[in-house]
Curated annotation (Swiss-Prot):
One of its GO terms (molecular function) is structural constituent of ribosome. Residues 1-37 are annotated as: Disordered. The gene is rpmF. Keywords: Ribonucleoprotein, Ribosomal protein. InterPro entries: Ribosomal_bL32, Ribosomal_bL32_bact, Ribosomal_zn-bd. This is Large ribosomal subunit protein bL32. The lineage of its organism: Bacteria, Pseudomonadati, Pseudomonadota, Gammaproteobacteria, Pasteurellales. HAMAP family: Ribosomal_bL32 (MF_00340). Belongs to the bacterial ribosomal protein bL32 family.
Amino acid sequence: MAVQQNKKSRSRRDMRRSHDALTTAAVSVDKASGETHLRHHVTADGYYRGRKVINK
């Protein structure tokens, strides 16, 4: 089992964790249908940037 040789300070621990924060997903509203979707993704209706790109 691995055992540390020297104790890491709170400062060094927190500096390491400074990049671990989570961000919320960027959500957009479609111009045509008003539906929310992920950026650069087609909506569930098949719209992308106000145009119908997938026929269902």
